[in-house]
């Protein structure tokens, strides 16, 4: 079904959109949930979807999302007691961001 709201992009059964208003991880997730049909921050499974999301960010017309090495929130999160979003890549290296920092995000 390709019935996405205006401004959203369809990929493999879901609709996605980049938002350039910086929010914390929690606030970005809440924002996404308020969108049509209780959406969430984007989950990225596989290279195809990773490339699609990267293209969404690179094609966005806002100044914020065109900055070099911009961080964006996605649905990856494993919260520790210190309020950090952390997980691990397949090579074992850590991925860690302060969840309270405000970044653009992808629903």
UniProtKB/Swiss-Prot annotation:
SUPFAM superfamilies given in the database record: C-type lectin-like (SSF56436)
Record flagged with keyword rRNA processing: no
Keywords recorded for this protein, A-Z: Disulfide bond, Secreted, Toxin
GO cellular component, as recorded: extracellular region
Molecular functions per Gene Ontology: toxin activity
The keyword Secreted belongs to this UniProt entry's keyword annotation: yes
Domain C-type lectin: residue ranges: 11-107
Subcellular location: Secreted
Disulfide bridge map: 4-15, 32-107
Domain of life of the source: Eukaryota
InterPro entries tied to this protein: C-type_lectin-like, C-type_lectin-like/link_sf, C-type_lectin/snaclec_domain, CTDL_fold
Subunit record text: Heterodimer of subunits alpha and beta; disulfide-linked.
Function as written in the Swiss-Prot or TrEMBL entry: Inhibits integrin alpha-2/beta-1- (ITGA2/ITGB1) dependent melanoma metastasis.
PANTHER family: MANNOSE, PHOSPHOLIPASE, LECTIN RECEPTOR RELATED (PTHR22803)
Similarity comment: family membership: Belongs to the snaclec family.
UniProt name for this protein: Snaclec VP12 subunit A
Lineage: Eukaryota, Metazoa, Chordata, Craniata, Vertebrata
């Amino acid at each position: 079904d390709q019935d996405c709201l205006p401004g959203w992009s369809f990929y493999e059964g879901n609709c996605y959109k980049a938002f350039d208003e910086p929010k914390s991880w929690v606030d970005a997730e809440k924002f996404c949930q308020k969108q049509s049909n209780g959406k969430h921050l984007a989950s990225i499974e596989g290279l195809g979807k990773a490339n699609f999301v990267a293209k969404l960010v690179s094609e966005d017309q806002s100044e914020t999302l065109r900055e070099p090495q911009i961080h964006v929130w996605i649905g990856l999160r494993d919260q520790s007691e210190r309020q950090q979003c952390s997980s691990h890549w397949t090579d074992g290296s850590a991925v860690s961001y302060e969840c309270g920092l405000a970044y653009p995000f992808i629903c």
